UniProtKB/Swiss-Prot annotation:
<feature type="region of interest" description="Disordered">
    <location>
        <begin position="177"/>
        <end position="206"/>
    </location>
</feature>
<dbReference type="GO" id="GO:0003677">
    <property type="term" value="F:DNA binding"/>
</dbReference>
<keyword id="KW-0238">DNA-binding</keyword>
<feature type="domain" description="HTH marR-type">
    <location>
        <begin position="13"/>
        <end position="157"/>
    </location>
</feature>
<dbReference type="Pfam" id="PF01047">
    <property type="entry name" value="MarR"/>
</dbReference>
<comment type="subunit">
    <text>Homodimer.</text>
</comment>
<keyword id="KW-0678">Repressor</keyword>
<feature type="DNA-binding region" description="H-T-H motif">
    <location>
        <begin position="63"/>
        <end position="86"/>
    </location>
</feature>
<keyword id="KW-0804">Transcription</keyword>
<comment type="function">
    <text>Negative regulator of protease production and sporulation.</text>
</comment>
<keyword id="KW-0805">Transcription regulation</keyword>
<dbReference type="InterPro" id="IPR036390">
    <property type="entry name" value="WH_DNA-bd_sf"/>
</dbReference>
<dbReference type="InterPro" id="IPR039422">
    <property type="entry name" value="MarR/SlyA-like"/>
</dbReference>
<dbReference type="GO" id="GO:0006950">
    <property type="term" value="P:response to stress"/>
</dbReference>
<dbReference type="InterPro" id="IPR023488">
    <property type="entry name" value="HTH_tscrpt_reg_Hpr"/>
</dbReference>
<keyword id="KW-0749">Sporulation</keyword>
<protein>
    <recommendedName>
        <fullName>HTH-type transcriptional regulator Hpr</fullName>
    </recommendedName>
</protein>
Length: 206
């Protein structure tokens, strides 16, 4: 590759990539700690909670979709999904017109746990939120991190970002804050699901 053709120098590339790497590492250490503390009362790990989150949003996600949107290996997605199934939080199924792929759905018990976790969220125990508060005080809103989202889009693709945006749009539209806690709106409860399933599912037979 002819580096002279690049619109940046090797030095600029190194400085940027290492800034991103080291800042991301520092940020993840804080995020990981807070995330683990949040879900600890429910005896879940981060991958398991992420799977519940994706299953709630997609309401019929394949294992490959769980792996893609959860940024984990397919075997990791499958193994943790099986553990969640054993606890009664997920059920495995097949689409009637797609017998090759295995899909997962939240059970009523799984949805109940997912909603309880959301309700238990405590902003005072989130270090990243605390770190962003000076910016909120200055600008009247939290950072929209559009530059980071653009980078992620170019790494993982439009599908990834579409599901990412949809999941937070669902939270925005279906939940409200009541007395300092997250609560699902009554009309969303009556609707019965977050995202409409486009193809019928049938349970897997053991």
């Amino acid at each position: 590759m002819n580096r002279a053709e690049e619109p940046y120098t090797v030095k600029e590339a190194l400085l940027f990539s290492q800034r991103m790497a080291q800042l991301s590492k520092a940020l993840w250490k804080s995020i990981e700690k807070d995330w683990q503390q949040w879900i600890k009362p429910y005896d879940l790990n981060i991958n398991e909670h992420h799977i519940l989150w994706i299953a709630y949003q997609l309401n019929g996600a394949s294992i490959s979709e769980i792996a893609k949107f959860g940024v984990m290996h397919v075997s990791t997605a499958f193994n943790f999904s099986k553990k969640l199934e054993e606890r009664g939080y997920l059920e495995f199924s097949k689409k009637l017109n797609d017998k090759r792929n295995t899909y997962i759905q939240l059970t009523p018990k799984g949805e109940e746990v997912f909603l309880k976790i959301l309700e238990s969220y405590d902003p005072t125990r989130n270090a990243v939120l605390k770190g962003a508060q000076p910016l909120h005080q200055l600008y009247g809103k939290f950072p929209e991190i559009v530059e980071m989202m653009s980078i992620i889009r170019h790494i993982y693709g439009d599908d990834f970002m579409e599901i990412f945006e949809k999941s937070f749009s669902n939270i925005e539209n279906e939940f409200t804050s009541e007395e300092g806690k997250m609560k699902k709106k009554q009309e969303a409860k009556e609707a019965g699901e977050s995202i409409e399933v486009d193809k019928p599912l049938e349970p897997l037979k053991n």
